[in-house]
């Protein structure tokens, strides 16, 4: 072995194995140049958020609805317009607005439709109607003179009630007499309420009417009392 070969072997033995050799450096340089020529690798695709939606799902995931309407964070849903504003905007856009319900404005220049109150009638008709006592179309017969006059009226008797009546111009004025012979206050009130309810369901002509409950009425049911009262009214000639 000559001195030249010995020097070459010593140089190779003393080289650090962690350092790249000249061939590796050349390959890396060529790879970097090729990559630069081809361009940078494409990035991950991100789905753009839809207007009015907030992107929370991350790359490649569908957007998640936001609780806030479009225009950016911090803008709440638009407030609904009232009937008049909606009708005006619809007319400007050539749209036919839906029929407005009771109590809503009928559009520009139109008065609002009166809405029903809790008992089913309008407030205007309720204010103009006369005050009723008890059942529908019935008013209370008041004053001793009115009761005294009915002694001369036409009468009809049943097993449970006695009726007397006189004609009047309009409406039905009713007096109901339930004595202590019928029972205690609770029983008397029950009989009185039943008689008034029966009269409310009948279509009576205008009259001053007196109904006197008999002691047997305390044990009668509603249907039995209704039949007996109708029979007494028929006997008196008030109903046919």
From Swiss-Prot:
Give the matching PROSITE patterns. RIBONUCLEASE_P
Query: What is the protein named?
Result: Ribonuclease P protein component
For this protein, the Enzyme Commission number is 3.1.26.5
Q: Name one GO molecular function term.
A: ribonuclease P activity
The protein's gene is named rnpA
Catalysed reactions listed for this entry: Endonucleolytic cleavage of RNA, removing 5'-extranucleotides from tRNA precursor
Any further remarks? The open reading frame (ORF) for this protein entirely encompasses the ORF for the 50S ribosomal protein L34 (rpmH). The two start codons are separated by four nucleotides.
Which residues does UniProt assign to the signal peptide?
Answer: none
Which residues fall in a compositionally biased region of kind Pro residues? Answer: 40-51
């Amino acid at each position: 072995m000559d001195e030249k070969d010995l020097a070459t072997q010593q140089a190779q033995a003393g080289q650090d194995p962690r350092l790249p050799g000249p061939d590796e450096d050349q390959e890396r340089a060529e790879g970097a140049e090729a990559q630069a020529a081809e361009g940078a690798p494409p990035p991950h695709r991100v789905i753009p958020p839809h207007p009015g939606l907030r992107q929370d799902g991350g790359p490649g995931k569908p957007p998640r609805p936001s609780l806030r309407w479009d225009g950016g964070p911090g803008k709440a849903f638009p407030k609904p317009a009232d009937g008049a504003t909606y009708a005006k905007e619809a007319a400007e856009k050539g749209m036919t607005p839906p029929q407005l319900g009771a109590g809503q404005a009928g559009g520009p220049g139109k008065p609002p439709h009166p809405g029903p109150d809790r008992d089913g009638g309008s407030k205007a008709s309720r204010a103009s109607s006369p005050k009723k006592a008890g059942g529908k179309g019935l008013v209370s017969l008041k004053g001793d003179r009115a009761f005294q006059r009915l002694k001369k009226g036409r009468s009809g008797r049943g097993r449970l009630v006695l009726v007397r009546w006189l004609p009047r111009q309009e409406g039905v004025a009713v007096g109901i007499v339930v004595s202590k012979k019928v029972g205690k206050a609770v029983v008397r009130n029950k009989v009185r309420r039943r008689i008034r309810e029966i009269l409310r369901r009948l279509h009576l002509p205008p009259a001053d009417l007196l109904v006197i409950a008999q002691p047997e009425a305390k044990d009668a049911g509603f249907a039995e009392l209704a039949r007996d009262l109708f029979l007494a009214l028929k006997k008196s000639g008030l109903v046919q």
